[in-house]
Each structure stands twice: as structure tokens, then as C-alpha cells.
């Protein structure tokens, strides 16, 4: 049994959306009948809302986007429900915001709900709750959401369906010398691609940059990621059965556990701690906790046990973790504590994730 997370982008749901969804439903149903479990992350609510409201283009204000999403979401779910019912299968709507996942208990509740739906043989259909998401707590795109969902449910495979056939060394639409990339054994090696990966089209928000970011999140959690051409819905059945195509991002050999994945990718840092070189070496090479004596400066205002960014002396991100003290306590103690033996722990190693492992 394979647990799949499948992500459908907005660009794939243009035109005759009902017929397109019926085509994808056949592939999803075939995998579920075979004994696999599938979670679907779908875009399309805003686009369908724009169609229903006869808008000439995607809105450019938050309020208008949220209103379009609210209009289109019910219609989107009705299409999936009808399409899967033909195959005798049920669907469940799950709308998420980042705030649902930032809280550890709610994160576990969301994971448990999805696991129960899968155990019942139901297809969870997930979308960001665009009608309610605030700007500072948005996933921003469903590529990121699909990667976080894959980590939360312990998926084996994440399939990102898009309107290109694979990853290229540069944009093949503008560069005739662009080379296809079929396998990526560590997505961080492709950071240089992100600068030219491109933004989403007129109706979408997820260009290749967000797909590379999603691949890094998922592979860090032990999930194999497939980037494949989804423009022909009939291809989905074969892709879920193991057909090679597109680009495969292989999982990290030492994947993060559930909690560390949550720390690294879900939490939004509320402040920063700047570290000296000795503290950086202790974290990187000795697996130590961060002591206050290794902190040179604190930025931002945050309460105790909230997520913070850790920066090395060059200002580069070293990692993330939960700070045991609030920002004022850290500031007050910086001028007092100079002895490592008397220095309190400000980020315990069990609540710390390094950027490059």
C-alpha cells in the first residue's frame, strides 16, 4: 500500500473543469481500488469563482480573492463529489490555514482527521481556506500546502501535477538550450534554479520556484516527490501505478521526524537570535543545545517557547527552534551571563532544526 498526496494546480483546471475533474477522478479511483491511499490537494476555487462571477481576470486585492474563493469552493467540491461518486467513492472537504498547523495540537488533530478519512476509504480533498486566510499566515500556494500535508500524514509519495513535462535547467519556453532534469538527489542542490524558475501564470500562484520549495520540504521529511505533466488527465492512473515521467526528487537519507518537520517548515519565526562562531560550531558539529552565552543579539519581540530564526555571524540562516525565554529575558541576560557553565539553554537541541543537515 502506498500513501499518495496528489496536487492539482489551477492551470490544469481551466476550460471544461467538470470533464477535467472526471478524468482525474478515474485515475484516483483506480489507485484507491488497488489498495493505495490518496489525499488530493486541489487549487481552483478562485478560478472557478472568477468564472461563476464572470470576472475577466484574477482579482488583485485580498478581499476580492477571498470572495472569489468563497464563491468557487462549493462548486469545486460539488464537481469532485459527483466525479468520485461515479466510482462508488466518497470525498471529504478539508480547508486549512497555516494557523491550523502552527498550533501543535491542531496540527496533530488535522493529521489524525486525515488518517481517519483514509482508513475509511474516503478521498480527502484539501484546499487552503482562502476565504479566511490572513496575509501573514497564508501558505501562499498549494505546492507548499501539499508538501506540508505529505509530511503531516507520513506520505510515501507526493505527485505535483503541472503544465510542464519536467524540471529543466532553465525555462524551456525562452531558452532553446534548456536541459531536462529527470532525477534530483538533493533539492538544495537546485537552489540556483529558483532565481529563474518563474512565477505562476495569470490564474495561478505556483510557479516552478514554489515546486522546488515544496520538493525540499517533502524530501526532508522522507517523501519521494514526482513533478509530472498533468495536462492529460488520463495519464494520472499510470503515474499512480509507477510510470516514470517528469522529474523525481529523491528523499533525504536521514528524514526529519514529524515534530522536527513541523518545527522546520510549519512554524513562522517570530524573532531572531544572532550567534557567535563557537555556538554555531557546537550546534553543527556536536549536536549541542544553544546556550545563552553563544547569543550575540536578539531581534524582534516574542514570548517564551515561540519559534525563532538562528543566524550565524554572516547573517545566514543556521536553523530554527523554540526559544525557552521571551525576547526581553534574552536581552536582559545577554549583559549578565558570560560563563558557559552558568548559561541557561535558550533553544534545546530537541526543539532545534538545522538548515543544512
UniProtKB/Swiss-Prot annotation:
Single GO biological process annotation from the record: L-proline biosynthetic process
GO cellular component: cytosol
Enzyme superclass (EC): transferase
Record keywords: Amino-acid biosynthesis, ATP-binding, Cytoplasm, Kinase, Nucleotide-binding, Proline biosynthesis, Transferase
Residues the record lists as binding substrate: 43, 130, 142
Binding locations of ATP: 7, 162-163, 205-211
Domain PUA: 270-341
MF (Gene Ontology): ATP binding; glutamate 5-kinase activity; RNA binding
EC numbers for this chain: 2.7.2.11
Localization, UniProt: Cytoplasm
Catalytic reactions of this protein: L-glutamate + ATP = L-glutamyl 5-phosphate + ADP
Chief place of localization: cytoplasm
Pathway: Amino-acid biosynthesis; L-proline biosynthesis; L-glutamate 5-semialdehyde from L-glutamate: step 1/2
Pfam families documented for this protein: AA_kinase, PUA
Coiled coil ranges: none
Similarity comment text for this entry: Belongs to the glutamate 5-kinase family.
Function: Catalyzes the transfer of a phosphate group to glutamate to form L-glutamate 5-phosphate.
Protein name, UniProt field: Glutamate 5-kinase
Recorded name of the encoding gene: proB
Amino acid at each position: 500500500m502506498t500513501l499518495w498526496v496528489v496536487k492539482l494546480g489551477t492551470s490544469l483546471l481551466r476550460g471544461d473543469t467538470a470533464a477535467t475533474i472526471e478524468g482525474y477522478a478515474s485515475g484516483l479511483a483506480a489507485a484507491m481500488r488497488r489498495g493505495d491511499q490518496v489525499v488530493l490537494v486541489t487549487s481552483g476555487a478562485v478560478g472557478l469563482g472568477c468564472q461563476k462571477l464572470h470576472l475577466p481576470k484574477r482579482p488583485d486585492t485580498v478581499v476580492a480573492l477571498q470572495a472569489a474563493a468563497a464563491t468557487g469552493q462549493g462548486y469545486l467540491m460539488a464537481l469532485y463529489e459527483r466525479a468520485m461518486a461515479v466510482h462508488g467513492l466518497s470525498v471529504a472537504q478539508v480547508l486549512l490555514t497555516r494557523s491550523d498547523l502552527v498550533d501543535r495540537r491542531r496540527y496533530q488533530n488535522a493529521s489524525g482527521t486525515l488518517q481517519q478519512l483514509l482508513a475509511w476509504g474516503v478521498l480527502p480533498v484539501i484546499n487552503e481556506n482562502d476565504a479566511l486566510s490572513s496575509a501573514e499566515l497564508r501558505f501562499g500556494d498549494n505546492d507548499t500546502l501539499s508538501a506540508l500535508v505529505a509530511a503531516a500524514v507520513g506520505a510515501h509519495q507526493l505527485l505535483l501535477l503541472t503544465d510542464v513535462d519536467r524540471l529543466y535547467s532553465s525555462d524551456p519556453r525562452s531558452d532553446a538550450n534548456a536541459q531536462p532534469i529527470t532525477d534530483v538527489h538533493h533539492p538544495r542542490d537546485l537552489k540556483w534554479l529558483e532565481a529563474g524558475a518563474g512565477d505562476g501564470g495569470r490564474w495561478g500562484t505556483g510557479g516552478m520556484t514554489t515546486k522546488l520549495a515544496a520538493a525540499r520540504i517533502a524530501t526532508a521529511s522522507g517523501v519521494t516527490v514526482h513533478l509530472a505533466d498533468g495536462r492529460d488527465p488520463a495519464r494520472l492512473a499510470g503515474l499512480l501505478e509507477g510510470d516514470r515521467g517528469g522529474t523525481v526528487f529523491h528523499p533525504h537519507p536521514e528524514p526529519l521526524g514529524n515534530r522536527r518537520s513541523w518545527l522546520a517548515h510549519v512554524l513562522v519565526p517570530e524573532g531572531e537570535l544572532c550567534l557567535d562562531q563557537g555556538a554555531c560550531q557546537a550546534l553543527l558539529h556536536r549536536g549541542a543545545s544553544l546556550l545563552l552565552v553563544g547569543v550575540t543579539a536578539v531581534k524582534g519581540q516574542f514570548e517564551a517557547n515561540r519559534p525563532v530564526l538562528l543566524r550565524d555571524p554572516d547573517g545566514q540562516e543556521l536553523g530554527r527552534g523554540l526559544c525557552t525565554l521571551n525576547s526581553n529575558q534574552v536581552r536582559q541576560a545577554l549583559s549578565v551571563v558570560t560563563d558557559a557553565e552558568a548559561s541557561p539553554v535558550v533553544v534545546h537541541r530537541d526543539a532545534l532544526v538545522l538548515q543544512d543537515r
